[in-house]
């Protein structure tokens, strides 16, 4: 970090009066903080790393108080970095600011194959942390497992289901699947039935796998009760909204069966609960019926959830959720993004496959391409319908796809209220919470950016408009 960059960062912290996802502040006026392990771990475990700024006192409105001893501070911070597994190599920068010495320590991100980074004295389970906003929170067992399974190439769709037997699978469906595989892969014809079952992950050590139970099971939920879909229609924009008659859900359904059956039934539920309007096609002048949301986008979102959700023991008690609100459709898939994939890479980079057996089977059983076209299809379909861009959220324990309809539009009153709200600088997250909208990316595009373009909102870091520490204010 350059001296001028640290100087700007200090100004930003004082102006915004806040820490952030990548910024931590410690006074260090009376000595080196004794417990930096939580922050060292959480910063190392996120893709952007983080910066610890020493010499600002949060209890005094981030007043510059200076550090007690620059050399000793760097030495003791390094000692704490060396007690992490793997060890951390912090990069220090020192400047004088308003007559006192300020020191920053840049904590680099470690490669995903080395995560989680944890404090050796506490062990992996108790010493691993994740950054959430401006807080360092202990990693859940699932989050630790997610890293470990990726490193060890563990695929939960291939794990055997102890109570399952071949008699509980649909023999005709398996035979048809194998026949298709033989036609496409001639070498399979030379293998024994047992070899084919093992190579196609239908069985593992002669026991049916999770993938085969979900695709060929007579009744998969008899063995895996919560690997299903729950679908609801809410008469409002938030869970808990009710009709004038006190009805909480206009429609609800638990959807079970094989993946193919659940996909078909889920789409049928969606079709039953979305509005249809008649429009005039501008290209041919003919009247056409158009659904509230593009069916192809809904299908791809549900299909992605079925194939790419987490199927580990940590999430097998959680079903996929489809939630209709008056202004949007949400599809919740258990488990966060897998491997190196990030929100920004969706639809652009080739993903690491969490469930390769399911992905292979889906090419034949669900008529999917397995060419990573799902996300681009969702985006394209929403654009063709002149609807807002789909919103993708990667949370600690779930992945959420949100499709907005035409009811979700900004209006003048909201703009005026938002401008008033930003009399003091506000982050994207704070603005999203104020508007009661879950997705910051949607808020940025539909609310914040139009007001910035109109000169009604200004940036606290104008030279870095996409900074994660950006805040917005009005005159």
What are these regions (language model features)?
Residues 1-297, 302-407, 426-427, 456-459, ...:
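Conserved N-terminal catalytic/coupling substructures associated with nucleotide/phosphate chemistry
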Residues 293, 437-453, 466:
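Short amphipathic alpha-helical interaction segments
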Residues 354, 410-414, 443, 447:
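N-terminal positioning helix adjacent to the helix-turn-helix/winged-helix DNA-binding module
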Residues 405-421, 463-467:
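Short alpha-helical segments that sit at the start of domains
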Residues 416-419, 435, 445:
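A carboxyl-terminal module marker
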Residues 424-436:
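Short acidic, hydrophobic short linear motifs in intrinsically disordered regions
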Residues 430-433, 445, 458-459:
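Charged, terminal alpha-helix-loop-beta segments
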Residues 460-475:
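Short, cationic-aromatic polyanion-contact patches
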């Amino acid at each position: 970090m350059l001296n001028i960059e640290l100087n700007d960062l200090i100004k930003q912290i004082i102006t915004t009066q806040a820490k952030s996802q990548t910024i931590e502040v410690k006074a260090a006026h009376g000595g080196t903080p004794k417990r930096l392990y939580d922050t060292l771990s959480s910063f190392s475990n996120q893709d952007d790393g983080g910066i610890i700024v020493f010499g600002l006192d949060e209890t005094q409105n981030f007043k510059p108080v200076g550090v007690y001893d620059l050399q000793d501070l760097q030495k003791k911070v390094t000692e704490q970095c060396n007690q992490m597994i793997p060890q951390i190599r912090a990069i220090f920068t020192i400047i004088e600011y308003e007559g006192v010495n300020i020191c920053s320590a840049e904590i680099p991100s470690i490669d995903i194959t080395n995560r989680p980074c944890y404090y050796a004295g506490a062990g992996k389970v108790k010493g691993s942390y994740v950054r959430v906003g401006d807080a360092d929170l202990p990693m859940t067992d699932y989050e630790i497992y997610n890293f470990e399974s990726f490193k060890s190439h563990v695929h939960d769709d291939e794990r055997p289901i102890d109570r399952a037997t071949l008699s509980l699978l649909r023999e005709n469906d398996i035979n048809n699947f194998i026949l298709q595989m033989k036609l496409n892969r001639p070498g399979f014809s030379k293998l024994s039935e047992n070899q084919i079952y093992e190579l196609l992950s239908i069985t593992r050590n002669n026991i049916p796998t999770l993938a085969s139970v979900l695709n060929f099971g007579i009744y998969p939920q008899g063995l895996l009760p919560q690997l299903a879909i729950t679908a609801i229609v809410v008469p409002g924009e938030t869970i808990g909204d009710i009709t004038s008659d006190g009805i909480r859900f206009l429609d609800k359904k638990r959807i079970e069966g094989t993946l193919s059956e659940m996909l078909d039934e889920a789409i049928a539920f969606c079709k039953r609960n979305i509005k249809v309007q008649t429009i005039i096609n501008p290209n041919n002048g003919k009247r056409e019926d158009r659904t509230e949301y593009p069916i192809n986008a809904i299908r791809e979102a549900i299909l992605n959830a079925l194939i790419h959700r987490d199927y580990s023991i940590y999430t097998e008690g959680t079903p996929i959720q489809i939630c209709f609100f008056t202004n949007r459709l949400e599809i919740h898939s258990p488990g966060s993004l897998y491997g190196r994939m990030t929100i920004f890479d969706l639809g652009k980079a080739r993903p690491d496959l969490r469930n390769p057996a399911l992905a292979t089977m889906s090419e034949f059983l669900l008529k999917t391409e397995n060419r990573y076209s799902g996300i681009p299809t969702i985006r394209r379909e929403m654009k063709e319908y002149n609807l807002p861009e789909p919103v993708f959220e990667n949370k600690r324990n779930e992945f959420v796809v949100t499709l907005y309809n035409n009811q979700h539009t900004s209006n003048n009153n909201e703009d005026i209220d938002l401008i008033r709200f930003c009399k003091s600088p506000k982050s994207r997250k704070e603005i999203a919470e104020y508007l009661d909208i879950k997705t910051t990316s949607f808020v940025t595009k539909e609310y914040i950016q139009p007001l910035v373009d109109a000169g009604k909102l200004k940036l606290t870091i104008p030279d870095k408009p996409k900074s994660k520490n950006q805040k917005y204010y009005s005159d």
